[in-house]
């Protein structure tokens, strides 16, 4: 059973990157979980009052003992070192994925990651919103679609592994 506690809908996030740039957004809902993260749909209200939609990936590893205290993630003393190493890897993965996205190949199935932020004792990756269904929700209608999807995933994973 997954013991992680997701951010609640309407939770405000004020994210700042290493350059001091800030973005204010509001969590709309959780859309997925992986072994190292929880993914949310979020919204930012522009100066004109329009909504800009984002995907936010929160570094929150499943296997570690981490509590959430007022939206702050607090790893146990025993897991602090593993958490910090994982967080560093999370940030490196952002850079690898960004290089892959802009490598000139067409990765229509990849999200455009915009920036990485540290906040609430963890890291967040901000991505451009995609109106496409998530991979978990995608239901191929036939074997040909399944094979096409698998080939795309294998191709991207192969390139990720080549990058280290």
Regions found by a protein language model. Name each.
Residues 155-164:
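Protein kinase catalytic-loop region centered on the HRD/HxD motif
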Residues 119-134:
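Conserved short submotifs of the Hanks-type protein kinase catalytic core
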Residues 1-22, 26-29:
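Juxta-kinase regulatory segment immediately upstream of eukaryotic protein kinase catalytic domains
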Residues 149-150:
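Activation segment signature within eukaryotic-like protein kinase domains
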Residues 43-95:
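ATP-binding glycine-rich loop module of kinase domains
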Residues 134-143:
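AlphaC helix of the protein kinase catalytic domain
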Residues 28-35, 39:
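Protein kinase glycine-rich loop
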Residues 102-123:
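Short beta-strand micro-motifs within the conserved protein kinase catalytic domain, predominantly
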């Amino acid at each position: 059973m997954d013991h992680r506690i997701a951010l609640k809908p309407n939770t405000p996030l004020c994210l700042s990157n290493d350059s001091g740039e800030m973005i204010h957004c509001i969590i709309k809902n959780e859309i997925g979980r992986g072994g190292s993260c929880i993914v949310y749909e979020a919204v930012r209200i522009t100066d004109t009052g329009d909504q800009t939609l984002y995907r936010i990936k929160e570094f929150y590893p499943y296997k570690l003992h981490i509590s959430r205290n007022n939206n702050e993630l607090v790893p146990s003393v025993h897991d602090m070192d593993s958490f910090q190493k994982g967080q560093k890897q999370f940030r490196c993965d952002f850079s690898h994925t960004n290089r892959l996205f802009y490598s000139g190949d067409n990765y229509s199935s990849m999200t455009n990651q915009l920036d990485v932020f540290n906040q609430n004792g963890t890291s967040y990756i901000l991505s451009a919103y995609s109106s496409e269904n998530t991979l978990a929700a995608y239901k191929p209608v036939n074997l040909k679609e399944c094979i096409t999807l698998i080939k795309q995933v294998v191709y991207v994973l192969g390139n990720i592994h080549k990058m280290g």
